[in-house]
């Protein structure tokens, strides 16, 4: 008879952490599924002040990518730097991450999808630019925080937790990197024509490569950089 493997206290904690992150994001997705169309209509309504629209959009974004890992950090008394937000290897992580995104960037140009380089641009950005320079700067920092920092850092933290829970002695494979990459791909529109398959391949290379770089450098700034200046910019 096969004996049941007994989990260590650390493994149990990591399982709880993953459940917290998953359930938090799921709860926000459920809310979005119920009232998402109304929220989108509200956020796109230029007759309403840009600030409440930005706040609503940022709240939903943070709920999906950021709230769960923040709860885990508070619960475990962990700091963000403990997950790789540090100076050491930061340039190496950023440089290597950029290389991982090169095939994806080439795909954007070759497929004719390039419409301009617009980092930190979301649906309320045009109205934000009409509010004056100071307000634009503040709003842009908010966008950078929720659509750049937290989205990129969210990948790093989840990857870190999965890798600690399911460690693999491999240089180029990581359960955390694989799961996070598939998660990122599944939550974006897909098609299965030639261009769709090329997009799938280049997206996989970009995200998986980014997280393998994180695994080797133990520096999360590459992930953050990618989501501020590449992923949400083209």
What are these regions (language model features)?
Residues 1-13:
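Short, Lys/Arg-rich, polar N-terminal cytosolic tail immediately upstream
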Residues 2-5, 74-85, 160:
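Cytoplasmic membrane-interface regions of multi-pass membrane proteins
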Residues 14-22, 53-61, 92-97, 136, ...:
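Residue-level signature of transmembrane alpha-helical entry/exit and packing/kink sites
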Residues 14-76, 96:
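Alpha-helical transmembrane segments in multi-pass membrane proteins
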Residues 26-35, 101-109, 180-190, 228-234:
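Aromatic-anchored segments of alpha-helical transmembrane domains
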Residues 34-35, 71-80, 166, 213-217:
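Structural signal for the C-terminal ends of transmembrane alpha-helices
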Residues 42-55, 80-150, 164, 169:
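Juxtamembrane helix-loop-helix connectors linking adjacent transmembrane helices
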């Amino acid at each position: 008879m096969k004996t049941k493997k007994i989990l260590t206290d650390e493994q149990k904690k990591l399982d709880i952490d993953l459940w917290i992150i998953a359930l938090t994001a799921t709860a926000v997705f459920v809310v979005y599924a119920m009232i998402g169309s109304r929220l989108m209509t509200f956020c796109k309504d230029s007759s309403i002040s840009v600030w409440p629209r930005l706040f609503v959009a940022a709240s939903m974004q943070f709920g999906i990518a950021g709230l769960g890992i923040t709860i885990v950090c508070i619960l475990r008394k962990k700091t963000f730097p403990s997950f790789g937000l540090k100076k050491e290897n930061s340039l190496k992580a950023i440089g290597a991450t950029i290389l991982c995104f090169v095939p994806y960037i080439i795909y954007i140009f070759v497929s004719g999808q390039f419409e301009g380089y617009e980092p930190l641009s979301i649906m309320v950005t045009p109205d934000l630019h009409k509010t004056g320079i100071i307000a634009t700067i503040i709003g842009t920092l908010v966008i950078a925080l929720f659509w750049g920092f937290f989205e990129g850092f969210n990948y790093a933290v989840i990857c870190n937790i999965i890798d600690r829970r399911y460690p693999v002695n491999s240089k180029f494979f990581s359960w955390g990197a694989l799961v996070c990459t598939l998660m990122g791909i599944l939550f974006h529109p897909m098609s299965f024509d030639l261009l769709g398959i090329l997009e799938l391949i280049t997206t996989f290379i970009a995200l998986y490569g980014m997280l393998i770089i994180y695994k080797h450098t133990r520096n999360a700034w590459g992930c953050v950089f990618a989501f501020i200046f590449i992923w949400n910019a083209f």
